[in-house]
Amino acid sequence: MGTILIADDDKTCRDSIQKVLEREGHKVRAAASVDGAIEALGTDHFDLVVCDYRMPGKTGIDLLIELRRLNSAVPVLMISAFADALVEAAVKRLGALDVLKKPIRRQELVARTAKVVGG
């Protein structure tokens, strides 16, 4: 099982994702902002980051840019209620593995996570 970081300003969504992933046996840490995620990434190792695209202040795009600046190879799954083809293309160009559309289906989250970290 993997160690996963969730970055989402929506507490309900963040808690829901955390609960699903913990039930699958993953160790999960959550952050309510991009800055919180960057701080967590500086102190711990993660096998995967699940990050919301649109958050107040810095966005998921900002997180991807910061990860690349730090030469981090941690895989990122972006989540968004606003994802369209342009958003998907932009985040993939910056290194995200894929975009999961909100509301996230449990089965899809489990399957995408398992592809990256096993489970």
Model-identified regions with their sequence ranges:
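Active-site T/S-Asp motif of two-component receiver
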Residues: 51-52
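C-terminal output helix
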Residues: 86, 104-113
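Two-component/phosphorelay signaling modules centered on CheY-like receiver
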Residues: 11-29, 94
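Short amphipathic alpha-helix used as the core "switch/output" element in two-component signaling
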Residues: 39, 61-73
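The feature encodes the CheY-like receiver
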Residues: 14, 56, 84
